[in-house]
């Protein structure tokens, strides 16, 4: 199996099932030597994305109440798709140095138990970070209210970038033009939020994962998504 096919598999599964599957698969494949460790930050940034069902059902239908012009909102996936195509083109002739023959099916309950426990550990950690950063995302708003801040809107937007699920709800509840709400939601979906970054770092613990590269890539994709969203707004609306 070539490295290109493994990276493509990681990206597709990450897009379908959503965060943090992309980072988890990247970490597992890198630990086994199936993917070059130099690509882990890039592949994680590309594959570690919110799933299409989350974007369509929660962000678009439930929060933004949008039933048309889905192409505008799906631009949050476009930069990662472009980056993935470029990455596959660069690695198209590289393959795994070691090929492991497939073994016959054996039901090993120890492996099943270990898989279940590892899955629960990841799930509980994910839920814990979501709860923690959902609380943290409200702190800037609370501070602004207590201090009688003249710019409460800025505090709300800053808080929204801590945890995306809660942040989208915050943005959609602001008294701002609808176009600006949509652009901010696109930025949140592409960037992922501070919570996603901390969770990604925890998945790659003790591996030398360079978080700053991941953050820079996510920020670049967020900016590009916003620009594409504005361009599509001008064309379609």
Go through the PLM ranges and name each one.
Residues 57-67, 137-150, 169-177, 196-205, ...:
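Transmembrane helix-loop junctions in multi-pass membrane proteins
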Residues 36, 52-55, 77-81, 178-237:
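C-terminal transmembrane helix pair
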Residues 1, 8, 29, 104, ...:
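Hydrophobic alpha-helical segments of integral membrane proteins
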Residues 2-64, 158-173, 182-205:
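Alpha-helical membrane segments and immediately flanking helix-loop junctions
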Residues 11-12, 43, 70-74, 127-128, ...:
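Hydrophobic alpha-helical transmembrane segments
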Residues 9, 117, 121, 125, ...:
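Alpha-helical transmembrane segments of multi-pass membrane proteins
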Residues 20-22, 48-57, 78-86, 90, ...:
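Membrane-embedded alpha-helical core segments of multi-pass
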Residues 73-149:
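Selected transmembrane alpha-helices and immediately adjacent juxtamembrane segments
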């Amino acid at each position: 199996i070539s490295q290109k096919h493994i990276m493509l598999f990681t990206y597709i599964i990450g897009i379908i099932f959503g965060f943090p599957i992309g980072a988890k698969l990247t970490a597992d494949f890198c630990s086994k030597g199936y993917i070059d460790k130099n690509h882990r930050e890039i592949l994680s940034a590309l594959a570690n994305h919110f799933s299409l069902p989350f974007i369509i059902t929660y962000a678009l239908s439930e929060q933004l109440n949008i039933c048309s012009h889905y192409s505008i909102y799906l631009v949050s996936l476009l930069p990662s798709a472009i980056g993935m195509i470029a990455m596959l083109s660069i690695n198209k002739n590289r393959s795994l140095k070691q090929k492991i023959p497939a073994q016959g099916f054996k039901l090993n309950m120890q492996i099943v138990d270990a898989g279940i426990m590892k899955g629960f550990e990841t799930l509980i950690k994910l839920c814990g970070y979501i709860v923690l950063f959902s609380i943290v995302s409200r702190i800037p708003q609370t501070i602004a209210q207590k201090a009688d801040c003249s710019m409460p809107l800025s505090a709300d937007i800053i808080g929204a970038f801590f945890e995306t699920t809660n942040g989208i709800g915050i943005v959609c509840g602001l008294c701002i033009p609808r176009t600006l709400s949509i652009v901010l939601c696109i930025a949140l979906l592409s960037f992922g939020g501070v919570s996603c970054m901390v969770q990604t770092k925890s998945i790659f613990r003790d591996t030398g994962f360079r978080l700053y590269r991941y953050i820079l890539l996510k920020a670049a994709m967020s900016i590009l998504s916003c620009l594409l969203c504005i361009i599509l707004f001008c064309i379609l609306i």
